[in-house]
């Protein structure tokens, strides 16, 4: 196992889910914090970052024009300080059926302007609502990524249901902190089962700050390399943004 770990390269991570963009949701409150978070991520090995501010009635409903303006400010500053870090724009969509009513507006919330959308649900969402959401998104011509799938009561209680979502066509994202056990034993147990069967498509930080929910992925990467191999670790933590969302 030591030989496998030595083959791993502990840099080049891609973070497709975080709240680093300042002033638009419950994540970074200002440009200074956003820059600190980017530096922290860079020093930890992240090289591509898709910023995904909330589209959520309680956590952030900033207008698209404001998000783009703040993104351009941050990306410009980041390019000067961290020229080899890619900064892209997406959105984390709190799923309600109304979000599919206007496909032009949905395009504004897609990952890097692609046909892929990152969707989240209430922690107590029922299985059927998630299933219907995945199918509805696919029917509109978009590809769903289910955000932090391990945070929903229905999925932690019924792991087989996550496999079903995958079979329906959804990609599965889990948070790095859940892999390393920071969100409790039952959550980690669920995630370990998914990783063992290679059900997980993306690991992301879901970072909100520089203290408790940080944009650091290297600890998780090291764990996955040790338990599940470097090839799978690279596939789910070093995604090519242009290839995935181009």
Place the predicted regions along the sequence by residue.
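Active-site neighborhood of phospho(di)ester-bond hydrolases with catalytic His/Asp-centered motifs
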Residues: 14-16, 50-52, 88-91, 145-147, ...
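Short acidic/histidine-rich active-site segments
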Residues: 199-215
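Non-catalytic positions within long, well-ordered alpha-helices that form the structural scaffold/packing
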Residues: 42, 138, 195-196
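Mid-to-C-terminal alpha-helical segments outside catalytic/metal-binding sites
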Residues: 3, 217-246
């Amino acid at each position: 196992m030591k030989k496998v770990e030595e083959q791993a390269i502990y840099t080049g991570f891609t973070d497709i889910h975080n709240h680093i963009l300042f002033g638009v949701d419950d994540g970074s409150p200002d440009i200074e914090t956003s820059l600190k978070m980017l530096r922290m991520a860079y020093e930890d090995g992240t090289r591509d970052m898709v910023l995904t501010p909330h589209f959520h009635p309680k956590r952030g409903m900033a207008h698209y024009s404001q998000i783009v303006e703040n993104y351009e400010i941050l990306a410009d500053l980041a390019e000067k300080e961290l020229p080899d870090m890619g900064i892209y724009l997406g959105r984390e969509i709190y799923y309600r059926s109304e979000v599919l009513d206007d496909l032009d507006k949905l395009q504004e919330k897609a990952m890097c302007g692609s046909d892929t959308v990152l969707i989240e649900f209430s922690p107590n969402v029922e299985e059927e609502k998630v299933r219907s959401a995945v199918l509805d998104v696919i029917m509109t011509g978009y590809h769903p990524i289910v955000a932090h799938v391990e945070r929903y009561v229905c999925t932690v209680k019924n792991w087989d249901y996550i496999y079903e979502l995958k079979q329906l066509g959804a990609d599965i994202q889990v948070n790095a902190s859940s892999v390393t056990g920071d969100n409790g034993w039952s959550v980690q147990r669920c995630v370990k089962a998914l990783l063992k069967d290679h059900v997980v498509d993306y690991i992301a930080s879901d970072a909100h700050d520089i203290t408790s929910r940080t944009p650091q992925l290297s600890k998780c990467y090291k764990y996955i390399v040790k338990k599940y191999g470097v090839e799978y670790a690279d596939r789910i933590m070093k995604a090519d943004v242009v290839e995935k969302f181009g």
